[in-house]
Amino acid sequence: MNFQQLKIIREAARQDYNLTEVANMLYTSQSGVSRHIRELEEELGIEIFIRRGKRLLGMTEPGKALLSIAERILNEASNVRRLADLFTNDASGVLTIATTHTQARYSLPPVIKAFRELFSDVRVELVQGTPQEIEALLHNGGADIGIASERLSNDPTLAAFPWFRWHHSLLVPKDHPLTQVSPLTLEAIARWPLITYRQGITGRSRIDEAFNRKGLMPDIVLSAQDSDVIKTYVELGLGVGLVAEQSGDAREADTFTRLDTRHLFDANTVWLGLKRGQLQRNYVWRFIELCNAGLSLDEIKRQAMEPEEVAIDYQI
């Protein structure tokens, strides 16, 4: 048994048993992946996967138990590699934050400024992506901290801390007819072409749920990944925009009017995620504390380092 075999078992569950994707994620060949699985099953004397021909469909009960053990072993191996840095280089290094465009552009600047004043020898790297990509970066060690409104709080292998709650607001050109509608309703918004976030990011599910509850089907003419792109197309006259309320800036006042929609759409929560059970440098803990002053450093460490209490579930 070796670490590569355990990584393959873990990655197979993460990639929905698609061995091509497993090979891509681990920078190896599909034939090599299959060989490692076969050799591990022969060594242990169990079948790890449920198969249909050559295709993997899921995990057997022994396979599920092995996956849980593999996660713990690989996480502890990662901790061993981090141990020397923790004792020799705790106030300098690189803090890698995986986050969405909206948080990187509008929410993080004052926090990062305050962080740099505390840790001038720590360089900050921002990696922008979708919530799914952010979650993957936390799992594979590509990021120390993940920040997003979706996914992070639902993953039992991550420790998630709330940062702040936010709502969507409606961005319209100045003097648009909707500025005269009071109170603003979903029915009124649905009469206009709509521009908003694409599926899976920045609270798009809240928008869809609100319209669905009313039996409305808005004409979403364009969806995008970040607020600045949405603003560009609203300015061009393609439609009205539903954007995160924190995406406002002074420059838009001459072009747009923002309309309050807190009574129409449910609130969203921005979460900060860490890989559960993983040793971190002091400046990682302090960054979380800067974002959530209601938690002490001891409480943050306790929540992040405690083992998950529920079984790992990759839709096994």
Swiss-Prot record:
GO terms for biological process: cysteine biosynthetic process. The keyword DNA-binding applies. The keyword Cytoplasm does not apply. One of its GO terms (molecular function) is DNA-binding transcription factor activity. PROSITE patterns: HTH_LYSR. Residues 19-38 bind DNA. It comes from the Bacteria. Residues 1-59 form the HTH lysR-type domain. Keywords: DNA-binding, Transcription, Transcription regulation. InterPro entries: LysR_subst-bd, Tscrpt_reg_HTH_LysR, WH-like_DNA-bd_sf, WH_DNA-bd_sf. PANTHER family: HTH-TYPE TRANSCRIPTIONAL REGULATOR, HTH-TYPE TRANSCRIPTIONAL REGULATOR CYSB-RELATED. May be an accessory regulatory protein within the cys regulon. Belongs to the LysR transcriptional regulatory family. NCBIfam families: PRK12679.1. This is HTH-type transcriptional regulator cbl.
